[in-house]
Design a protein with these regions (language model features):
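Catalytic core of soluble alpha/beta enzymes
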Residues: 245-260, 278, 296, 300-344, ...
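Residue-level detector of anion-binding/catalytic polar loops
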Residues: 293
Length: 468
């Protein structure tokens, strides 16, 4: 029987162990997509408790706690103490066995705090106090955590109207780790509620200094903000979409639709889809002009629980995997940009694992030989960000594309304790490839090439792909 979470955790063969310890583990971290709060990095935030750094904003844990019968006030309540919330989480942890939360929890305790104990109600107080004592030390600040995990670059997720003041402050402070913005313009194409859209466009006008009364004005304002993001080191965009939009439309139609929604009138379903289709193309062209990488996270059904959405807002644990037939629209959208000669580097993330092979084969349609892996299959996202999901994503990519050109892992997280997800990914990768070597499916004579592939997927591919 193997020990739980020892140095060879998840590494089932000798080859896997060598690949991880001698190659993957030595690589720095490039976290090219995350949801860290930039101000916390700029101010080098000090965490007052383990609850703040671990449970604050973590909808994965909240979902598990609710499922375990924990009252909402212990998840998101304002009048509940940090200890009370942590105690309820500790009571829940033993019930998360076989859920990735069980592994993440103990990997984070071990790598951040040097704690090998299993978290449960009996150990909760001891672990809580020990972690809180360490969090009071300077090296456990926000920046300290990033240094601890040898982070080299992080890319936050930012709206076009953001001032990026905290990115600027961080850079000017001389902090050695790069914190770069990512362009996330979802609100500029969210035309379902006219009043919300108009309020956003008015904010865009204020920030850009461009008076907006037409569609062309809006695009000019967005381009000005896009230029500003580029000046601040932005290399990527990101789009959170239910599905791909690729309706046929004319420029005149889009201008009319803009006037209608900006004037406060509700759009038809057809008009909404046409507008979103046009905006995806506009954004794609902007990114191409600057050599950015565009990312698409698609396939989530969000805010399913109306009651809790009204109470807590979005991103609080009430989203799930959607079922959309989007392959044709995805193809049409990519082809539309490619036909114009304006298809930039692209990463596609699916939330429904049924689409793994769809994406893995879609990539090959638009690789053009200009750079290795120009169109990428993103690492297992959200509900798929776990051992089984990672393996399935990498197996599909291996069978139908080139795993060796994969840009690898990202945290997609709001937490400064989530960097061990890179370790979890690297161990899973090394175990997958190591088994192939041991089984004679990859020649041991090519072990130097295998070693390099592991280092590339862990670090070098991303560094080159994003020009960091």
């Amino acid at each position: 029987m193997k020990n739980f979470m020892d140095e060879n955790f998840l590494l089932q063969t000798e080859t896997a162990q060598k690949l991880y310890h001698e190659h993957a583990a030595k690589m720095p971290i490039i976290d090219y997509h995350c949801h860290l709060i930039p101000q916390m990095v700029a101010d080098d935030h000090k965490f007052k408790s383990l609850t703040e750094i671990w449970l604050g904003g973590d909808h994965y844990k909240w979902r598990a706690m609710r499922t375990n019968g924990v009252e909402e006030r212990y998840c998101t309540g304002k009048d509940t103490s940090d200890w009370e919330k942590f105690e309820k989480w500790a009571e829940t942890v033993p019930y998360t066995m076989r859920n990735p939360l069980y592994h993440w929890t103990h990997l984070e305790l071990k790598t951040a705090f040097g704690i090998d104990k299993v978290l449960n109600p009996k150990t909760a107080r001891e672990i809580y106090d020990e972690c809180n004592a360490k969090l009071a030390l300077p090296e456990y600040s926000a920046r300290g955590m990033m240094r601890r995990y040898r982070v080299e670059v992080v890319c936050t997720t930012d709206d076009p109207v953001d001032s990026l003041e905290y990115h600027i402050k961080t850079r000017e402070s001389g902090f050695e780790i790069k914190m770069l913005p990512t362009w996330r313009p979802d609100k500029a194409m969210a035309v379902e509620i006219p009043a919300d859209f108009r309020a956003y466009i008015e904010k865009l006008s204020e920030v850009s200094g461009i008076a907006i009364s037409t569609f062309d004005d809006m695009i000019a304002a967005l381009r000005k903000c896009h230029d500003f993001f580029a000046e601040q080191g932005c290399k990527l965009s990101d789009h959170g979409i239910e599905e791909f939009y690729a309706e046929d439309y004319t420029d005149a139609e889009i201008k009319t639709i803009f006037n209608k929604v900006y004037g406060g009138k509700e759009l038809t379903r057809e008009e909404i889809l046409k507008f979103k289709s046009a905006m995806l193309v506009e954004f794609g062209e902007m990114d191409y002009e600057k050599g950015w990488t565009q990312q698409f996270h698609y396939g989530a059904i969000r805010n399913n629980n109306t009651k809790m959405f009204k109470l807590l807002g979005p991103d609080t644990g009430f989203d799930s995997i959607g079922e959309f037939t989007t392959a044709k629209a995805m193809s049409k959208f990519l082809d539309r940009l490619n036909t114009k000669g304006k298809l930039t580097k692209t990463i596609l993330y699916n939330l429904n694992p049924c689409a793994n092979e769809v994406i893995a084969t879609m990539l090959g349609n638009f690789q053009d030989g200009t750079i290795p892996g120009k169109i990428q299959f993103g690492s297992g996202w959200w509900f798929l960000d776990q051992k089984d999901g990672m393996e399935k994503q990498m197996n599909a990519l291996s069978l139908l594309g080139l795993l060796s050109r994969f840009v690898g892992m990202l945290t997609d997280s709001r937490s400064f304790l989530s960097y061990p997800r890179h370790e979890y990914f690297r161990r899973t990768l090394c175990n997958l490839v190591g088994k192939d070597v041991e089984n004679g499916e990859i020649p041991v004579l090519e072990i130097d090439r295998v070693n390099q592939m592991i280092e590339d997927i862990s670090y070098y591919n991303a560094k080159k792909f994003f020009n960091f």
